[in-house]
């Protein structure tokens, strides 16, 4: 190290110690005046039109730590007096400057070492837990050999399906394979029949046909189907025909699948009902002929009500291509059989099974009415039922009248004929309900106003 660089380094270190109030010992300055050297250097480079700060930074990287020459003279005298207080110089690391990058590298190394130690400790803990869990789960680790009495020496021989001791070679127990017999890749091997050796699971709709194991033949597919149907119970064969008819009608009429499944369950439970009185006590109720079609239509009608997606009798009759009277007759017969069934066999919710809200929420999207206006129509219909303004009409007619009141109240451009055609109700019926509801429309829109009218008029008591 040259004399000039050593002088600059010593001055910078002393100034830093004094500013930070460090307890390090002050290093003795060389006899050469550092400030005079810097002034000489700046005077030499001033002709080159270079800024003094840039020159200092380029040639003396730590020169900014020195005192500013513009400071008060009193502060300079105090600092020079402090520098003159000399103790014994520190012999260690005088010639080595403190590099900030070395400090950062050392800190990174310490952090990396700490993280590695943490990872190693976590891995060791996980390994210990894994071994503990294995010893708890595996029964062979804790079992004792019946031949030599050693513990933890039993091994599972999968090829022979036995539990063998690794010390004495004695067979202690047999093993059972709880996995599948073999895997089936959905007949990708080209074989027509399946390779499973067990039958299908029990079916709620066909309990008798799902029992036992069906052995498939090697003939053509048509013979297999005949063999399958010949082995099926007659009653379940007729049930399958009914279920196919329900599925076909629901799919053609855009009825959701959940309604079709509910209708199948209702028909299945009705077919299992038995007579409770008369000459046929204990015998199952037989449903056949035209009576069966009416019962199927009634099951779909009830399933729509149970799933809050009601259909009118006229719609159900149109789906099946039968008269409305047959649908009504089927509903009456359905209720009659339901009364004669065992307790809790068929559970129907008589309350709110067919409400005005269900009809409104079903038909408003077809009228291109948004959700806010739909909620207003629902509120009008509910408050109308609470005030008993149109109690002599069915829910479908009240829903149509509530939609018409909402259209007039909100000033929407929807024709009354379109509502009557969509609901299947005459214009006269809608006009009757409208005249009953329209005078109370401002109150029916607000639940608080409706409550006030109910209390004032004492409608509910």
From Swiss-Prot:
Pfam families: TFIIB (PF00382), Zn_Ribbon_TF (PF08271). Sequence repeats lie at residues 246-327, 360-430. GO terms for molecular function: TBP-class protein binding; zinc ion binding. It comes from the Viruses. Residues 113-142 are annotated as: Disordered. A zinc finger (TFIIB-type) spans 141-173. Keywords: Metal-binding, Repeat, Transcription, Transcription regulation, Zinc, Zinc-finger. GO terms for cellular component: transcription preinitiation complex. Zn(2+) binds at residues 145, 165, 168. SUPFAM superfamilies: Cyclin-like (SSF47954), Zinc beta-ribbon (SSF57783). Residues 121-137 have a biased composition (Low complexity). One of its GO terms (biological process) is transcription preinitiation complex assembly. PANTHER family: TRANSCRIPTION INITIATION FACTOR IIB, TRANSCRIPTION INITIATION FACTOR IIB-RELATED. Belongs to the TFIIB family. This is Putative transcription initiation factor IIB-like protein. It comes from Acanthamoeba polyphaga mimivirus (APMV). The lineage of its organism: Viruses, Varidnaviria, Bamfordvirae, Nucleocytoviricota, Megaviricetes.
